Amino acid sequence: MKILITGCCGFIGFNFANFLAKSNKKIRIIGIDNLNDYYSINLKRKRLKELNKNKNFIFYKIDINQYEKLKKLYKKYLFNYVFHFAAQAGVRYSLINPKAYIEN
């Protein structure tokens, strides 16, 4: 079984991906994240380092708005399930840059 998790370095995506990876080693988990700097890049890197300890986890640095890259990923893995946790964080930022939220 192949599962795509978007936003895998965010709080919810990380915890979900880590739980799945540890609970069933037969599942192949593909995680994507754009690793934007809205909040701590170091925190995201720590989470990614933790996820990479799981042999059934693979990471791609992809923004969900990069349609062609996503299309290639879908063709490569033919996912059974997609869990979409990618989102632009921060309510206040939405007042300054609403386009970032619309595109996401």
Indicate residue ranges for each PLM-predicted region.
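N-terminal Rossmann-like NAD(P)+-binding domain of SDR-like oxidoreductases, especially those catalyzing
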Residues: M1-N104
